[in-house]
Amino acid sequence: MISGVSALPFVRVRQHVNPLAQKYLTPANPLEWEKAYSTPHQPLHLDIGCARGRFVLQMAQVEPNWNFLGLEIRESLVIEANQFRSQLGLTNLHYLYCNANNSLQPLLSSLPTGILQRVTIQFPDPWFKTRHAKRRVVQPELVQDIANYLAVGGVVFLQSDMEFVAVEMCDRFAANPAFKKVGTGEWLTENPLPVATERETTTQNRGEPVYRALFERSS
């Protein structure tokens, strides 16, 4: 139970959602930023694939001088997450139901320049089969959308418990000239953020590795 939040009915959802299915091909409408946040000109942290949204829910409380936007393709989870946010009275947090692979441009194009300063993509669906690789969230087009709107000096934090997923995500960002990898090692040993995701905590408690990397918007 999250402190200050009354119990909500548990929402059961499909673990895997095909982002190429017809129902997910319509891009999200632009946000009315002034209605979504009490202080819309604070720096924005975008969490792509936020699931139940617990990570950004905690981040919004730890970093009240930032705004947080969680994107999730499973609508029932977004409804639940926004209920939690409302119960806590957080005005620097918003969740949006959308397919990130076709919605970043219409969402972020209305942001003032320099507002988007941090992006996280954590433990995305691995889509193990090669024929399903196009369903993985980190595609070259998504990387370019992030490059178009992330402030120079802004960062992208990636992590997964599947090494092949982490490698593919890193390869996609490394292939874009707008990004440079931070650090000299292949993987970060520590999470640079003050909050861990539930999946991260569970994985580490089992003694299993988490593959992390940080990229900076360089030009």
From Swiss-Prot:
Gene3D superfamilies: Vaccinia Virus protein VP39. Keywords: Methyltransferase, S-adenosyl-L-methionine, Transferase, tRNA processing. The keyword tRNA processing applies. GO terms for molecular function: tRNA (guanine(46)-N7)-methyltransferase activity. Pathway: tRNA modification; N(7)-methylguanine-tRNA biosynthesis. GO terms for cellular component: tRNA methyltransferase complex. Its EC number is 2.1.1.33. The active site is at D125. S-adenosyl-L-methionine binds at D47, E72, N99, D125. Substrate binds at K129, D161. It holds the Pfam family Methyltransf_4. It catalyses: guanosine(46) in tRNA + S-adenosyl-L-methionine = N(7)-methylguanosine(46) in tRNA + S-adenosyl-L-homocysteine. Catalyzes the formation of N(7)-methylguanine at position 46 (m7G46) in tRNA. Belongs to the class I-like SAM-binding methyltransferase superfamily. TrmB family. PANTHER family: 3-DEOXY-D-MANNO-OCTULOSONIC-ACID TRANSFERASE/TRNA GUANINE-N 7 - -METHYLTRANSFERASE (PTHR23417), TRNA (GUANINE-N(7)-)-METHYLTRANSFERASE (PTHR23417:SF21). This is tRNA (guanine-N(7)-)-methyltransferase.
